[in-house]
């Protein structure tokens, strides 16, 4: 009887350990990584107020939808970045949806301290134009669970 209980305990411990292991992360496809890197470079340029880099990264026919639903264009976006973003603005949890070999949506979450709402879901559409990735469209959606946060 003792042997059976010991064997059963060993099986249970082994099964528990096996199930508690987190699965290894899947490698990010090269296409997705390229777009995530492009998105991060764009956000870093915006934080650093590198307006020349920001301007180059945005397509001339860019359109965006603001948190309140208003439409805006390239000039509005570049002008808004002149004021700067809080230095502790964070972007995380990047996901890429490939549309074609030359276009994709990069969705991610963003925290902008001091802004209302400070928690946002971002969706940026990138297109390869003349061999360069450029931002064509952006939609900003407030994170509903935090839309009324006053900070």
Regions found by a protein language model. Name each.
Residues 19-56, 61-151:
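A beta-strand edge to alpha-helix "cap/lid" segment located at domain peripheries
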Residues 6-16:
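Bacterial N-terminal signal peptides
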Residues 1-4:
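Positively charged n-region of N-terminal signal peptides that target proteins for export
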């Amino acid at each position: 009887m003792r042997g059976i209980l010991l064997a059963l305990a060993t099986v249970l411990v082994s099964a528990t350990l096996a199930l508690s292991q987190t699965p290894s992360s899947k490698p990010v496809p090269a296409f997705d990584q390229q777009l995530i890197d492009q998105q991060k470079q764009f956000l870093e340029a915006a934080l650093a107020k590198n307006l020349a880099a920001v301007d180059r990264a945005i397509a001339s026919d860019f359109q965006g939808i603001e948190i309140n639903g208003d439409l805006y264009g390239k000039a509005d976006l570049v002008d808004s970045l002149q004021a700067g973003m809080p230095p502790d603005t964070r972007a995380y949890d990047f996901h890429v949806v490939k549309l074609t070999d030359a276009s994709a949506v990069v969705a991610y979450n963003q925290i902008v301290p001091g802004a209302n709402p400070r928690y946002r879901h971002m969706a940026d559409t990138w297109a390869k134009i003349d061999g360069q990735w450029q931002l064509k469209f952006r939609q900003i959606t407030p994170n509903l669970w935090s839309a009324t946060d006053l900070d």
